[in-house]
Design a protein with these regions (language model features):
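Structural beta-alpha unit
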Residues: 1-14, 87-121, 128
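Small/aliphatic-rich secondary-structure junction motif
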Residues: 8-65
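General small-molecule cofactor/ligand-binding pocket signal
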Residues: 50, 97-101, 150
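Short secondary-structure boundary segments
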Residues: 51, 124-126, 153
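Short, hinge-like loop/turn segments at secondary-structure boundaries
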Residues: 64-68, 115-117, 139-140
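A short acidic, glycine-rich active-site loop
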Residues: 66-80
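Glycine-rich, Arg-bearing micro-motifs that act as flexible, cationic patches
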Residues: 120-144
Length: 153
């Protein structure tokens, strides 16, 4: 007789179970969320929408209370993102969660993907010209090589 082993987590079996989509309020991130939602619906996966509140160091140099400024901007953006996710989740039968972190977008997405045991990560292409020289969050996620990463233009 064969002894049964307790079921344990195994990445990449029978399609993705958790898809993480990074949001920052940009048009490309909203397109990425819509793409990820379609993928999650077709795969019957859970969609985890992740917004990482950036730390504004420039505000501190100008004497602005960083915590207050970041918090106000973040709350407005979080409200906008929540409203958008409610709109498209009502259209489809879709399991989803909304997560928000504070700090660096790359590290926030890595933390979220690790904690949620993500099978895939979807992000929007960077809209910043400077990222051609210093690298974007999407490029850093791809180079990490820890999950399949889809970059939506």
């Amino acid at each position: 007789m064969t002894e049964q082993q307790p079921q344990r987590f195994e990445r990449g079996t029978d399609g993705p179970k958790v898809i993480v989509a990074g949001l920052d309020g940009s048009d490309s991130s909203m397109r990425a969320a819509a793409y990820a939602a379609g993928l999650a619906r077709r795969q019957n996966a859970m969609l985890a929408l992740v917004y990482v509140q950036p730390v504004m160091t420039a505000g501190a140099a100008l004497g602005v209370p960083v915590g207050d400024t970041t918090g106000e901007v973040a709350e407005d953006l979080v409200s906008e993102i929540r409203a958008a996710t409610e709109r498209f989740s009502d259209a489809w039968d879709l399991r989803w969660e909304f997560h928000t972190f504070r700090g660096d977008p790359y590290n926030g997405l890595v933390t979220a993907a690790d904690e949620l045991k993500a099978d895939a990560v979807v992000v929007g292409a960077s809209e910043s010209a400077g990222h051609r020289f210093i690298g974007s969050v999407a490029v850093r996620l791809v180079k990490a090589g820890r999950w399949p990463v889809t970059v939506v233009p």
